[in-house]
């Protein structure tokens, strides 16, 4: 039986091999600098951008595979090693029999099958606040910045007919981003205590400083509970040109009297087929560059020879 650490070592070995391939590709391309062959800076920038996207896809795919495989293996090993007598009251302690006893949200687990989505890998770069976010916080006297959510947007989150952003609790990185007053407002709306209860106010801000005021609410579904940004969401989609595949990071922070969500966006990751096309194009361009450099070298040798003959004559 292959243990979790053995499988991890195997996956890490595969990652090292592909890292070597990626670095070799990069060095091959960089060996033919555009300054030496008359290539424009724009063409060079485009080539480096394609290489950057290729490396990002390789690292992303490997990280996803490693995390998913290791998690499954460790879960299987844990179940096999568990003593049945340690939990004789399994039915009574099932998550489906639990209920929320306070307004502080608890992550809900269901025993019903749900549609699996690829996990979003959160990197160290994701957890580093951007400069514009820090500037916005200074302007409004903001504090307590937290990375609370990372999501690759599906069609449903940018569909103008659905008009909402869904934030499942089990995907939220830090549930402790709301104060007691905001929790109270969300809870009152969820329980439909009064028609005047609309949820908690939140201001969404982007890198351009554009702000939109929305309502944060709670929706319960079969598989999980969610926080939802609803009315006015379509304007946010338009403001930020959100589309299917956009990678969205949400940072929360508080001014003295308001909750803020800062939207940090990344371009959609390239598809695997695009990755292969990029690699093929890089190899083709590298061959052309090598041929051009060799032609320039031969031309230089011919010129030197002719000059030498003229001097001798």
UniProtKB/Swiss-Prot annotation:
What GO molecular-function term can you cite, just one?
DNA binding
Q: Which residues fall in a compositionally biased region of kind Polar residues?
A: 84-99
Question: Where is region (Disordered) located?
Answer: 80-110
Q: What keywords tag this UniProt record?
A: DNA-binding, Nucleus, Transcription, Transcription regulation
Q: Which InterPro entries match?
A: At2g31720-like, B3_DNA-bd, DNA-bd_pseudobarrel_sf
Q: Tell me if Nucleus is a UniProt keyword of this record.
A: yes
Cellular component terms (Gene Ontology): nucleus
The record places the DNA-binding region at: 169-267
Task: Indicate where this protein resides in the cell.
Answer: Nucleus
PANTHER family, alphabetized: B3 DOMAIN PLANT PROTEIN-RELATED, TF-B3 DOMAIN-CONTAINING PROTEIN
Q: What name does this protein carry?
A: B3 domain-containing protein At2g31720
Q: Which organism is it from?
A: Arabidopsis thaliana (Mouse-ear cress)
Gene from which this protein is expressed: ARF70
């Amino acid at each position: 039986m292959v243990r979790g650490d053995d499988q991890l070592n195997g996956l890490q070995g595969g990652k090292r091999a592909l890292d070597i391939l990626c670095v070799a590709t990069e060095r091959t391309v960089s060996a033919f600098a555009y300054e030496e062959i008359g290539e424009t800076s724009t063409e060079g920038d485009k080539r480096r951008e394609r290489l950057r996207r290729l490396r990002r896809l390789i690292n992303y795919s490997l990280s996803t595979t490693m995390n998913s495989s290791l998690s499954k293996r460790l879960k299987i090993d844990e179940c096999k090693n568990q003593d049945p007598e340690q939990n004789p009251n399994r039915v009574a302690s099932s998550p489906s029999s639990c209920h929320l006893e306070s307004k502080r949200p608890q992550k809900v687990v269901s025993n019903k099958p749900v549609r699996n989505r690829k996990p979003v890998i959160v990197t160290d770069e994701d957890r580093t606040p951007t400069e514009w976010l820090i500037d916005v916080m200074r302007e409004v006297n903001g504090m307590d910045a937290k990375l609370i959510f990372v999501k690759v947007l599906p069609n449903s989150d940018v569909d103008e007919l659905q008009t909402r952003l869904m934030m499942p609790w089990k995907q939220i990185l830090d549930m402790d981003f709301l104060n007691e007053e905001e929790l109270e407002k969300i809870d009152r709306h969820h329980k439909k205590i009064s028609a005047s209860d609309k949820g908690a106010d939140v201001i969404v801000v982007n890198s351009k400083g554009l702000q939109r005021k929305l309502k944060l609410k709670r929706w319960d579904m079969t598989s999980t509970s969610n926080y939802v940004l609803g009315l006015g969401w379509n304007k946010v989609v338009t403001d930020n040109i959100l589309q299917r595949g956009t990678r969205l990071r949400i940072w929360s922070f508080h001014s003295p009297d308001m909750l803020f969500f800062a939207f940090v966006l990344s371009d959609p990751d390239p598809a695997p087929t695009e990755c292969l096309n990029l690699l093929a194009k890089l190899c083709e361009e590298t061959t052309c560059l090598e041929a051009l450099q060799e032609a320039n070298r031969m031309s230089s040798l011919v010129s030197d020879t002719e000059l030498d003959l003229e001097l001798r004559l």
